Amino acid sequence: MLRLRTPSRIHITLIDLNGSIGRVDGGVGLALEEPHIEIKAKESETFVLKGEPINRERFEIAAAKMAEYCGRGAEIEVVSDYDAHVGLGSGTQISLAVGRAFSELYGLNLTTRQIAEIMGRGGTSGIGVAVFDHGGLVVDGGHSTKEKKSFLPSSASRAKPAPMIARLDFPDWNVVLAIPDLKGFFGEREVNLFQKSCPVPLEDVREICHLILMKMLPAVVEADLDEFGKALKRIQELGFKKAEVEQYGELIKGCFDLADCIGMSSTGPTVYAITDSNAGGIERSLRDYFAEKGYECRTIVTKARNRGVEIEV
């Protein structure tokens, strides 16, 4: 019996949805300890899914793609998974976990990038693929416009996974997740968001790059939460991240005053705050904020995960 445990991830921002330099996308993201995907797997001629997964269809689709690739099945027991379309990257982690399970069981020796290509993941953001292997804070380098000629989300892009260009261990800060019970942007809604918001202004892209290279990454190395928070808050006001936040009207933007280091993950609706103190107070404030707006809100206090997938035989 094989056991795999993967991180979740925050997607902090896409970097360049202007594309005039000859590359598009790029991104920054962070691996988290919780929530997580955990599965057990063993050889089987047919596909058998056990447990009570939230994302049954995603597991079935991933297994079908691997069965088509290698001609074998597997018995997979889902020990833990988490909601899709909330901005925490469950789709990529499920796909990669199932793919790695098949690779390990049948000696396929597939790299994570190869599995991602089989699964059709990582066509816009390379963050999920990178944190699966490495954990930590990751920057990916996007795609050449020779390969990807339009602005599309990963779910609608057939480009290869973006290359990882930087990876740092993240400090031992608390990460507070607030997951309000409202519909995120995925499928056709997400495609439409890209089409109506892109290309973003080049000056926004340049400022995002400046913030990442000269404020955010040094702040991680120096464990300077104040500077990290300043970069993070400004990024919420720029480029495609601004467009993502604005899809929720004033709802998401309105909670950004509740912490000094706060943002929205991916297309939302998950909001995250990073703190070295008072995690409980921030958690309560976020929960109360969404309750006052009429939304139930699940919260999780976790930490960054500075390692990737765990595999036990």
Swiss-Prot record:
GO molecular function: ATP binding; beta-ribofuranosylaminobenzene 5'-phosphate synthase activity
Pfam families: GHMP_kinases_C, GHMP_kinases_N
Pathway connected to this protein: Cofactor biosynthesis; 5,6,7,8-tetrahydromethanopterin biosynthesis
Gene3D superfamilies according to UniProt: 3.30.230.10
Catalyzed reaction equations: 5-phospho-alpha-D-ribose 1-diphosphate + 4-hydroxybenzoate + H(+) = 4-(beta-D-ribofuranosyl)phenol 5'-phosphate + CO2 + diphosphate; 4-aminobenzoate + 5-phospho-alpha-D-ribose 1-diphosphate + H(+) = 4-(beta-D-ribofuranosyl)aminobenzene 5'-phosphate + CO2 + diphosphate
Keyword Transferase attributed: yes
Record carries keyword Membrane: no
Domain of life: Archaea
EC number(s) from the headed UniProt entry: 2.4.2.54
Activity relative to temperature: Optimum temperature is 70 degrees Celsius.
InterPro entries on file: Beta-RFA-P_synthase, GHMP_kinase_C_dom, GHMP_kinase_N_dom, RFAP_synthase, Ribosomal_Su5_D2-typ_SF, Ribsml_uS5_D2-typ_fold_subgr
pH dependence per the entry: Optimum pH is 5.3.
Catalytic class of the enzyme: transferase
Keyword terms, alphabetized: Glycosyltransferase, Transferase
Protein role: Catalyzes the condensation of 4-hydroxybenzoate (HB) with 5-phospho-alpha-D-ribose 1-diphosphate (PRPP) to produce beta-ribofuranosylphenol 5'-phosphate (beta-RFH-P). Also catalyzes the condensation of 4-aminobenzoate (pABA) with PRPP to produce beta-ribofuranosylaminobenzene 5'-phosphate (beta-RFA-P).
Self-association state and partner proteins as the record states: Homodimer.
NCBIfam families: beta_RFAP_syn, BetaRFA-P_synth
Family: Belongs to the beta-RFA-P synthase family.
UniProt protein name: Beta-ribofuranosylphenol 5'-phosphate synthase
